[in-house]
Every structure is written in C-alpha cells, then in structure tokens.
C-alpha cells in the first residue's frame, strides 16, 4: 500500500493482465531482476511526482527496484525510483527511500488521500 496506507497498487507479472486505459496508479509490470523486484509502470494519468508540484505527464514511465537487505542487524527494504517523462523532464528523476521492518503494526495509522478540496478519488483533476 502507498500514500499513507489506503491505496493499493497491483503488480502484474504477466503483461497480458495489464489494463489498457490510464489510471492514477497506472499499469505496473513486475519481474525479478536478479534479487531485485523490478516494476515498470506506464499508462498513468498526469499528476505530480511530489506534493510540492513537480508535474509528470501521461507519457511518463516509472521504473522501481525493490531491494531487501539487512543493515545493522535489522531488516530493511530500499525502493529506488526512476521517473522518465519526455514531456516535462530534461533528465530522469531518481530517488531512493529506505524502510525498516517494524516488529508489529502498532505505529501504523493509515490515512485517506485528501487535498484541500476533500478526499481524492480516481478521475479527480486539479487544475490551477
């Protein structure tokens, strides 16, 4: 789950299962790349890479690698994300984030995706 825990992404391992139309989540095709889970997402509706307004177009392709590792005796997962958008970016946008496995879900507090106009749902458009 992403976005504070109330959205679900579906990774397909078979390209034949991908939907044709663009969505906020896009169509994600997953495969194993050595020990990394590689996920390539296409067919997203235009949106923002970050909350502060870096836009991406419906032509953007997001490639992610999910890597599990042990550091300092604890389980971690690192997600490396590359956004390639020929319409809005002059170069690829690359970021990595690391997450530590917790013993339980006692600190997990899922929140809905909201904007200043209320809850966000599929099909919403935010124009300036």
Where are these regions (language model features)?
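Hydrophobic small-molecule pocket/channel-lining residues, especially in calycin-type beta-barrels
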Residues: 1-128
